[in-house]
């Protein structure tokens, strides 16, 4: 059994992660990328970790091997791509374009791409496992399996309305999954 405090923490953390993914995409349609939207997006992966753990724990008995493999790849990919995303959004954002191009012309480019591929593959597998297990709502599980990998693999592309829309869908899927966790947490009586 998962402690209710852990589930509540994961739910709140997941809602914040979803907002940190979705809101910058909406804002950037009007403003373009800013230091603030980049910072907010950069912290989203760290906020998503507790949610991912509890999503897995909730479905581990019914998700089988696919759920376990998907979770393992997703959590490792989240760590790798979360670090890469933080670097891109918070550190490299403030450097001049020629400097960034120089930095990303060599091995770091392959490391960033590799982290995106591991994250995308893990997210697809874990999203499929969620949809098949039926423990979590299917619509956000499928959106999770589709939107987050597209977002990761599109990270090197210039900002566009399409990228902003994907941010919105991905953020909504993460927040929806988080809210669905919170809806199932029994209230603690007398505490």
Please provide the spans of the model-predicted regions.
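Hydrophobic, aromatic-enriched alpha-helical segments typical of multi-pass transmembrane helices
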Residues: 1-191
């Amino acid at each position: 059994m998962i402690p209710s405090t852990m589930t509540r923490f994961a739910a709140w953390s997941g809602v914040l992660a979803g907002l940190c993914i979705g809101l910058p995409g909406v804002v950037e349609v009007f403003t373009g990328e800013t230091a603030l939207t980049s910072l907010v997006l950069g912290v989203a992966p760290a906020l998503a970790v507790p949610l991912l753990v509890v999503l897995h724990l909730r479905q581990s008995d019914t998700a089988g091997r696919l759920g376990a493999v998907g979770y393992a790849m997703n959590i490792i990919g989240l760590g790798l791509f979360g670090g890469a995303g933080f670097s891109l959004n918070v550190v490299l954002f403030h450097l001049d374009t020629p400097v960034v191009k120089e930095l990303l012309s060599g091995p770091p480019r392959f490391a960033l791409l590799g982290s995106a591929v591991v994250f995308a593959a893990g997210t697809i597998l874990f999203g499929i496992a969620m949809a098949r297990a039926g423990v979590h709502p299917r619509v956000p599980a499928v959106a999770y399996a589709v939107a987050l990998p597209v977002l990761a693999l599109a990270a090197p592309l210039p900002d566009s309305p399409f990228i902003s829309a994907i941010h919105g869908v991905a953020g909504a899927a993460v927040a929806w999954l988080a809210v669905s966790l919170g809806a199932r947490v029994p209230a603690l009586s007398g505490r």
